[in-house]
C-alpha cells in the first residue's frame, strides 16, 4: 500500500459574526432566495446563518446527503454551539434543507457537535463519527446512527448511551483531538479510522480499530506524524485506482491490485470526500470562508460557501491527484459563446461578450508559440508560491511568457478586476508553469481581504506548447482549474462596481510575446435551487 500525503491549505478571514434572518436582505421571498451581497447562484450555502466544514457526505437510497458544520442561531462560528446541518439532493446541483441532523444535547457533546464523517456499515446503516466537546470542554469522539436506514431522507439520528466511544487520550496535549475520518473495513474484519491529535507537540494521525463500531482500540503507531504543525485538521484516508478515473469504496484494499491509498492532511479544516456507489467516483467537498468584514456578514445574515463538488482521481503517472467539477454542473449551462484561433498580442485585452459573466463557466486553451524565446529565467529562491504570486505574478506586471489568462468580475473601467492567469519560467532547460489568482484589485472596498494565491502546475508545456484553464464564476465565488485539474485555486471576491448586471469578462496577455486562444467556450449558468423553501418537493418527485 502506497501513501500520498498532499498538504492542503486555505486562506480565510477569521472575523466571524452574527445576525438574525429577520433583518437580512437575502431572506427567502416567496420561497426563492434573493442574490444580494455576494450570495451565490449555483454553489451550496444555507439559506441563512453560519456553515463551515463538510462533515459526512454520502449517497444513500438514491439521494445525496450532505452534512456540515452549522450554527442554527446565527452566522458566527464562536457563539452558539455547532450542530450538523443536513441537506439532500438528487443531482448534486439542487438542494433541500432538512434542518439539523445532530445537536449538542448530551453530556458528551453539550458544548458542540464538531467535525467528523459518515460511514455506511455492513447492512446499509449509515453512522456518524464525530468530535464532541463535553461538559468540561474536552474533545472526545462519539458515534450516532441513522434511526431508520430505510428512510430515504435519513431525518432521525440516535446517539447510543455508550458515548463517548473514545475518551481523551493521556498523551494528547492542548485539547487537540478531533475530526474522525470515514471508517474502512480491513481484510481482518476490523473497522479502522483516523483521528487528528497533537502528541508531543507534533500533529499526528492516530489510527483506531474496532470490531463493532462501538469499542475502539488505538494502534501503537500513528499513520502519519509531522512536527511542522501541532494538529492535522480533518484528515482523510481513501483509495484511488492507479489506472483510469474510477473512484473506489473506502474499504478497497491495495495488495497489488492497482490501488493506491491517499492520506489527505491539512493545516486547516477544509475538505471531505465520499465514494458514490453505482457511479464509481470519489467526490470531494471544500468549504470556502468569507473574506469580508464583520459588518458585512452581520448585515447579510449568512457566512460560508461550499465549492462545487469535485470528482477526484489519480493522474496517468500515478503521482498527482486531479480535481474537476462533477459532470452534473453542465446541466446548468445555458447560453454559450466561443472563440477559436484568436491571437492576443503583448498587452492585449479581449472582452468576451454575450453571457452574464457574473454567473458563468469558462473553459479556455492557450497556446504559446514562442515559448523558447520568451520565457524568463526562474530563480531557485522562488519557493513560496504565495510570495511569488504577490511579487512576480501580479496581473498588472509584465513578463516574458505571461502573465496571461482571464480577468473576471471586472467593472467597466477595470478599476475592479480579479485575474486568473499563468506565467511560464525557464530553469536549466526545463519550464515551470505558475498559476495565480490575484485579488489585489478585486474590490474597491477597504474592509475585505485581498491577496494573491498561486501554485505550480505540473504539466509538460514544452511538449504541448499549450495549457488549459477552467474558471467557475458565481458572484462572490471563483474556482479555477489549471492544466486539467492539476492546480486548483478557490477564492471569494466582493466587488462594489462589478455588480451582477455590469460585470465584464476578458482574455488578457501581459507577456512580451503573442499568446493564442486556440479554443474558448463560455456558458451562462442557470440559478440552481439551493436550500430554498420549495426544493424538497422537487427533489423527492424526481
UniProtKB/Swiss-Prot annotation:
Domain of life: Eukaryota
Disulphide-bonded residues: 389-436
Keywords (A to Z) from UniProt: Apoplast, Cell wall, Disulfide bond, Glycoprotein, Glycosidase, Hydrolase, Secreted
Induction, as annotated: By rice blast fungus (M.grisea) 48 hours after infection. Down-regulated by sucrose in excised leaves.
UniProt-listed InterPro entries: ConA-like_dom_sf, Fructan_Metab_Enzymes, Glyco_hydro_32, Glyco_hydro_32_C, Glyco_hydro_32_N, Glyco_hydro_beta-prop_sf
Pfam families to which the protein is assigned, alphabetical: Glyco_hydro_32C, Glyco_hydro_32N
Entry's Gene Ontology molecular function annotations: beta-fructofuranosidase activity
Catalytic activity: Hydrolysis of terminal non-reducing beta-D-fructofuranoside residues in beta-D-fructofuranosides
EC number: 3.2.1.26
GO biological process: carbohydrate metabolic process
Record field: transmembrane: none
Family, as annotated: Belongs to the glycosyl hydrolase 32 family.
Protein name: Beta-fructofuranosidase, insoluble isoenzyme 5
